[in-house]
């Protein structure tokens, strides 16, 4: 449905204990140009998600969401947020580990605790800054380059690069998330600006498909 609605995409991550539903935060998601629908980046607690958070949360409550962890997606239209997807699970694609690193509580242990009957007592909003950047291949070819996966700590800023293709691999562009060459995740629990860390990672990234020459 997302590809037929006009407007930015946001997520809302919630925790519920059966009595209360808490919005812990969400991602503002950047997408590729139409007609394809590929996520290219995501910012934790971006301006669109913050501006429409209460309206999004109200829609989930009206739908009956109230227990456990839930990952929902909305399109922000000129008439407000439109609910397009509810998943009764944690957000995935590596962002669950990002939230565990960013939160002041254990993301996974809290989810398990809810199913053991524990209540949500205290502050479960996740603050700080986080950015996820997907390096997307622009064409088919043989993967070439030397970039590898790593985790780097620079004071409060943690950069994690996960390489998703290997050198020598024959790659066929599919205009989907199968075109990802790597995922770069950067977090700062204290909320520091992440722009320089992202630029450093991208400037050192060396992996791309080379065009095959027909014989």
Each PLM stretch: what is its role?
Residues 33-37, 93-98, 206-207:
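A short, polar/proline- and glycine-enriched secondary-structure boundary/capping micro-motif
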Residues 6, 104, 177-179:
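Short Pro/Gly-enriched coil loops immediately N-terminal to beta-strands
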Residues 1-79:
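Internal nucleotide-binding/catalytic subdomain
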Residues 26, 84-86:
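Beta-strand-dense domains in secreted/periplasmic systems and polymorphic toxin scaffolds
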Residues 50-72, 78, 87-141:
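Active-site "cap" helix and flanking loop/linker of ATP-utilizing ligase/carboxylase catalytic domains
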Residues 3-5, 88, 100, 190:
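Structured beta->alpha junctions
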């Amino acid at each position: 449905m997302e590809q037929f609605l006009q407007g930015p995409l946001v997520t809302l991550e919630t925790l519920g204990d059966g009595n209360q539903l808490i919005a812990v935060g969400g991602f503002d998601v950047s997408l590729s140009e139409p007609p394809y629908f590929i996520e290219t980046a995501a910012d934790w607690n971006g301006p669109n998600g913050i501006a429409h958070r209460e309206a999004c949360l109200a829609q989930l409550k009206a739908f009956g969401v109230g227990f456990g962890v839930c990952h929902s997606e909305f399109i922000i239209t000129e008439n407000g947020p439109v609910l397009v997807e509810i998943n009764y699970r944690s957000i995935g694609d590596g962002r669950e580990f990002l939230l565990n690193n960013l939160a002041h509580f254990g993301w996974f242990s809290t989810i398990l605790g809810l199913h053991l009957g524990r209540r949500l007592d205290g502050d479960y909003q996740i603050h700080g800054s986080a950015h996820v950047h997907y390096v997307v291949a622009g064409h088919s070819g043989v993967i070439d380059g030397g970039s590898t996966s790593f985790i780097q700590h620079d004071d409060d800023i943690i950069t994690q690069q996960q390489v998703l293709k290997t050198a020598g691999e024959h790659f066929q562009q599919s205009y989907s998330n199968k075109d990802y060459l790597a995922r770069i995740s950067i977090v700062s629990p204290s909320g520091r600006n992440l722009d320089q860390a992202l630029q450093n990672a991208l400037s050192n990234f060396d992996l791309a498909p080379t065009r095959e020459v027909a014989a």
